[in-house]
A protein has these predicted regions:
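N-terminal active-site segment of His-dependent metallophosphoesterases
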Residues: 24-84
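N-terminal secretory signal peptides and thylakoid transit peptides that target proteins
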Residues: 1-14
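Extended active-site neighborhood of metal-dependent phosphoesterases/phosphodiesterases
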Residues: 25, 80-182, 205-222, 231-274, ...
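Short acidic, glycine-rich surface-loop motifs adjacent to enzyme active sites
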Residues: 181-198
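Acidic-and-aromatic substrate-binding clefts and catalytic sites of carbohydrate-active enzymes
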Residues: 43, 75-80, 105-106, 196-201
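A short C-terminal boundary segment appended to hydrolase-like catalytic domains
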Residues: 27, 266-330
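Active-site glycine-centered loops adjacent to acidic/histidine catalytic or metal-binding residues
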Residues: 38, 73-74, 101-102, 193, ...
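Short, well-ordered beta-to-alpha junction loops that form the rim of enzyme active sites
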Residues: 138, 191-196, 228, 299-300
Length: 330
């Protein structure tokens, strides 16, 4: 049985080679893109709060000769103060795209955040050599009978809403998704901040739309990517792979611990509320072929100061926290 690395080096290489030989380089060749999630740039609060890690993520995209890069939300917490950091991504040496996460609007209005991310709206689509990428915005709250995007001045906190009312899609996103999938001539990839593999009403409705598109043309949608949960997880439902891309920095935990030295707590005031990683620029390079087959090449890192989760708290012994994005194929 081939390992994931062997698959990437052999099976996918053969598929890519065949595709490249059979088509012009700019038409039908596999699409390769860089993906990162949940960087949480917030100086003085979380490690790592310089631009060094982001520069390394961008450098990976350059070395891999990607067609574009996309970040899956929670990139930062203040789109005004973090504008230079955002622009380091926006102005990378390859095309870049952005997904809005729930924390991106913490200190700015939705309009201010979109302006910093160079977005007209939170949901949109784009095509690269026949592959369609569909971005959804999962940051609406259902408040007093209306869908309102979270952000400064919105009048509510998504963290105080019930589970059924937070991290919602706007109703207009469903017909948009139907049209985007229905008019695609090649494979489609769906991108969002939070997962669409769950059992909440919006996720179920998205999967119904995806299932209808795949019935009309089998294999139209093979992959969906998200962030939000700070973990590496692949779930396959009805022939579609839903991959949660891990954060390069940390996992938030709902209690404080005393596992890091005082100097760390003085530098980053919320480090005692997280399991911190070692700064490895965790990211993934995804290749999508014209027939919808894909391969994900991840990266592995370590824990901050070499301190494993169970050393921080016995409560974390069975959480499965790991600073890794594994390799996958489909």
């Amino acid at each position: 049985m081939l390992s994931r690395r062997e698959f990437v080096g052999a099976g996918l290489a053969a598929a890519i080679g065949a595709a490249a030989r059979g088509r012009a380089a700019d038409e039908g060749a596999p699409v390769r893109f860089l993906v990162a999630a949940d960087i949480h740039y917030r100086p003085g609060v979380f490690p790592f709060d310089t631009d060094e890690q982001l520069r390394k993520i961008v450098a990976r995209g350059v070395s891999e000769k990607v067609d574009f890069g996309i970040q899956l939300g929670d990139f930062q917490h203040d789109a005004k103060r973090g504008r230079a950091f955002i622009d380091l991504w926006n102005d990378a040496p390859f095309r870049t795209f952005n997904v809005i996460g729930n924390h991106d609007d913490d200190a700015t209005t939705p309009a201010e955040t979109r302006a910093a991310l160079r977005l007209e709206r939170g949901w949109y689509r784009f095509d690269v050599r026949g592959v369609r990428f569909v971005v959804l915005d999962t940051n609406y709250g259902f408040v007093n009978g209306a869908f309102v995007h979270y952000g400064k001045g919105c009048g509510f906190s998504p963290y105080k809403l019930g589970a059924a009312d937070r991290l919602r899609l706007h109703p207009d996103e469903f017909p948009f998704l139907e049209e985007a999938l229905g008019t695609a001539t090649g494979p489609c990839v769906i991108l969002s901040h939070r997962t669409l593999a769950g059992e909440d009403a919006d996720a179920v409705r998205v999967r119904q739309i995806v299932a209808a598109a795949n019935r009309a043309r089998p294999g139209r949608v093979a992959l969906a990517l998200c962030g939000h949960n700070h973990c590496d997880r692949m779930v396959r439902r009805d022939g579609v792979s839903f991959l949660t891309v891990n954060s390069p920095n940390h996992v938030w935990i709902p209690f404080r611990h005393k596992g890091y030295p005082d100097e760390d707590v003085r530098r980053w005031r919320e480090i005692d509320h997280v399991v911190a990683y070692d700064g490895t620029p965790l990211s993934a390079v995804v290749t999508v072929c014209a027939d919808g087959h894909f391969a994900v090449r991840g990266l592995a890192g370590g824990f901050w100061r070499g301190i494993a989760p169970e050393q921080l708290s016995k409560k974390l012994t069975k959480r499965g926290i790991a600073p890794v994005i594994r390799d996958y194929e489909g």
